[in-house]
Amino acid sequence: DGAAAVIICKEALAKSFRPDPVRVKGIGLSVTSGEPYLKPSFAYTGFPATAQAAQSAYEQAGVTAKDIDLVECHDCFTITEILNYEDLGLCEKGEGWR
């Protein structure tokens, strides 16, 4: 499959690796019990926790999805990655495949 890693550290240490380190301006976390996914009405067309976490991170950072240049998105299945693009607000619902 693949792998990704991020080193999070103080700015002074980051600058010892490169002169222009990336700064984290916002983070978001949202979890569900899994219960919503058991409801017959759940359509499996997105992940509400992803949308909630994205909104929280965007608000903290003072940005919108349109300001994002790069996303490292977990893709355990192709459809999961596509739905995450939509839930992150990177595209309209139903347009993630583009």
Task: Label each residue range with its predicted role.
Residues 12-15, 29, 59-63, 86, ...:
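Generic secondary-structure signature for well-ordered alpha-helical cores
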Residues 55, 69-72, 82-85:
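Generic hydrophobic alpha-helical scaffold/packing signal
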Residues 1-52, 56:
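Condensing-enzyme catalytic core mediating Claisen C-C bond formation in acyl metabolism
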Residues 7-8, 27, 68, 79-82:
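Weak global preference for isoleucine
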Residues 19-29, 65-74, 94-98:
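Beta-strand segments within the central parallel beta-sheet cores of soluble alpha/beta enzyme folds
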Residues 53-67:
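Phosphate/pyrophosphate-binding loops at sites that engage ATP/ADP/AMP, CoA/4′-phosphopantetheine
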Residues 36-41, 75-97:
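Short glycine/threonine-rich loop-to-helix capping motif typified by GTGT followed
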Residues 2, 73-76:
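Generic detector of well-ordered alpha-helical packing
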